[in-house]
Amino acid sequence: MNLHEYQSKHLLKKYNIPVPASEVVFNPDAAVDAAAKIGGDRWVVKAQVHAGGRGKAGGVRLVKNKEELKSAVKALLGTRLVTYQTDERGQPVNQILVEQTSDIARELYLGAVIDRASQRIVFMASTEGGVEIEKVAEKSPEKILKVTVDPAIGLQPFQCRQLFFGLGLQDLKQMRSFTDIVMGLYRLFTERDLSLLEINPLVITGSGELICLDAKINIDDSALYRQSELREMRDTTQEDEHETMAQQWELNYIKLDGNIGCMVNGAGLAMATMDLIKLSGGDPANFLDVGGSATKERVTEAFRIIVSDKNVKGILVNIFGGIVRCDLIADGIISAVKEVGIDVPVVVRLEGNNAQLGAKKLADSSMNIIAAKGFADAAEQIVKQVGVIA
């Protein structure tokens, strides 16, 4: 789950991490009131969307008076912001962050992620702040400093100092401030079950202060059950509607660009299914794992989600029956196809407990369901069926 910038900064303040004074607003008049509360004679207007690249897309604007402020907020609210990280439809702008301007002398990058290889939290820092860190990693990886956190003892102050001096900084007052910031970010990361935390940029002001000018936070979805405060911050308007619907039924769904819908029980089998579709000359339209308990209700909702994608020209269902009986799965598929009213070909491969009985039920049904003879046959059949339609 992603947070908006204003929500991320709300969390940073709770951990005593310095951020500029700001207010989130939902209409132009409120923006003027926010500016009066913040003070100053110049402000930064920031569209709140779950995407990077807002500045280049016109979603971040510097305004020099309250008339410009009101005009900028009015121009952004209710629009859809298209950046390099969104699709062509963009993301809806429903709120604006009005922020105090900062006297920027230097921009740095600071971030933390979970490294899957070492299974540990890794903190990263770079002198290349204010730019896309992915490009820095691609073109100049040596400019990214890293420290790995031992989970047995946690982040240590000496590791913060390693990053500080690695950035070419020397001022002792700044070192203490930097250490406090990084240690605070570590507490935030671990206590709130984050999967990604980025401060880009972390700025040094003209007076030598360190301020987190922008913040990006991703939370581990699997931990939301114990993060009630963060769970309430979810903005479903920024998420794919199909993925939101899938989450309500505990289905793991990710939309792709192809035209062959996939429904599989098990993430590993789902990935193998997509691979085999590609090898057979087709393109998967989604990743969808119905999990171990492929009940009739969940199968029905999975079909609804798949066919709501207008690009889908055929569906491949690949089920391995371990504890679940394949004949009961077949009954659920037949019932779901009838209930949803699917008019594209459906190829089903069943393997495991009562697979032959399940395949017979599919073959004997009057529905447009093809019972495949094996994994490879299933992929070839659906690619063939979709090719005929195309």
From Swiss-Prot:
Q: Which UniProt keywords apply?
A: ATP-binding, Ligase, Magnesium, Metal-binding, Nucleotide-binding, Tricarboxylic acid cycle
One annotated GO biological process: tricarboxylic acid cycle
- Name the PROSITE patterns for this protein: ATP_GRASP (PS50975), SUCCINYL_COA_LIG_3 (PS01217)
State where ATP binds. K46, G53, R54, G55, E99, S102, E107
Q: Which residues form the ATP-grasp domain?
A: 9-245
Name the EC number(s).
6.2.1.5
> What NCBIfam families does this protein's entry cite?
PRK00696.1 (NF001913), sucCoAbeta (TIGR01016)
Provide the function of this protein: Succinyl-CoA synthetase functions in the citric acid cycle (TCA), coupling the hydrolysis of succinyl-CoA to the synthesis of either ATP or GTP and thus represents the only step of substrate-level phosphorylation in the TCA. The beta subunit provides nucleotide specificity of the enzyme and binds the substrate succinate, while the binding sites for coenzyme A and phosphate are found in the alpha subunit.
| Name the record gives this protein | Succinate--CoA ligase [ADP-forming] subunit beta
Supply the source organism for this entry: Coxiella burnetii (strain Dugway 5J108-111)
What's the name of its gene? sucC
